[in-house]
Amino acid sequence: MSIKSDKWIRRMSEQHGMIEPFEAGQVRESEKGRVISYGTSSYGYDVRCSNEFKIFTNVHSATVDPKNFDENSFVNYTGDVCIIPPNSFALARTVEYFRIPRSVLTICLGKSTYARCGIIVNVTPLEPEWEGQVTLEFSNTTNLPAKIYANEGVAQMLFFESDEICETSYKDRGGKYLGQTGVTLPRT
């Protein structure tokens, strides 16, 4: 299994729609000034989060149960900057829509800009033939409020291609998050 380069990412996105919308290079500035970088890097793709957030709250004194998740545990928020309360988390989604090839497994890692501020990004692997917008989880590990900037870089996707095609892909299994759009809560 080998990691794929910027040339491969560019070709797969421009010719096969692997990432849409796609940024062929690194963007570090916008009309608003400096931004946290996004777009194609040497061996990965830095994704942006949209301006759609679900901020965790415990006003209902609920128990977090992944098999019976209560949507009321979140406050919906739309805006350019999301403020995550201390020791809490928020969900968001990527601006980009992904179509992962059958021979590829994609791993997501947080950007150092956020990690150095105590903000951790968590995403499970994007499996072969999965497609959709990626739901992102931001954990604020600090005891201070933390900011997440919409439409700026938040995490990096790394693409690994196997030397052998898998027998059963995510699509073949009818995975429950296939084709997801928007911020998607846990499903069982």
UniProtKB/Swiss-Prot annotation:
Write down the Gene3D superfamilies for this protein, in alphabetical order: 2.70.40.10
Q: What is its EC number?
A: 3.5.4.13
Q: Name one Pfam family in it.
A: DCD
* Annotated pathway: Pyrimidine metabolism; dUMP biosynthesis; dUMP from dCTP (dUTP route): step 1/2
Keywords from UniProt, A to Z, are:
Hydrolase, Nucleotide metabolism, Nucleotide-binding
Catalytic activity as recorded in UniProt: dCTP + H2O + H(+) = dUTP + NH4(+)
Q: Which GO terms describe its molecular function?
A: dCTP deaminase activity; nucleotide binding
| GO biological process terms on file | dUMP biosynthetic process; dUTP biosynthetic process; nucleobase-containing small molecule interconversion
Catalytic machinery residues: E137
Q: Where does dCTP bind?
A: K111, S112, T113, Y114, A115, R116, T135, L136, E137, Q156, Y170, Q180
Instruction: Please give the family membership noted in the entry.
Output: Belongs to the dCTP deaminase family.
The UniProt function text for this chain reads:
Catalyzes the deamination of dCTP to dUTP.
User: What does the annotation say about its assembly with partners?
Assistant: Homotrimer.
Q: Which PANTHER family match?
A: DCTP DEAMINASE
The identity of this protein, by name, is dCTP deaminase
Q: Can you name the source organism?
A: Marinobacter nauticus (strain ATCC 700491 / DSM 11845 / VT8) (Marinobacter aquaeolei)
The lineage is: Bacteria, Pseudomonadati, Pseudomonadota, Gammaproteobacteria, Pseudomonadales
Q: What's the name of its gene?
A: dcd
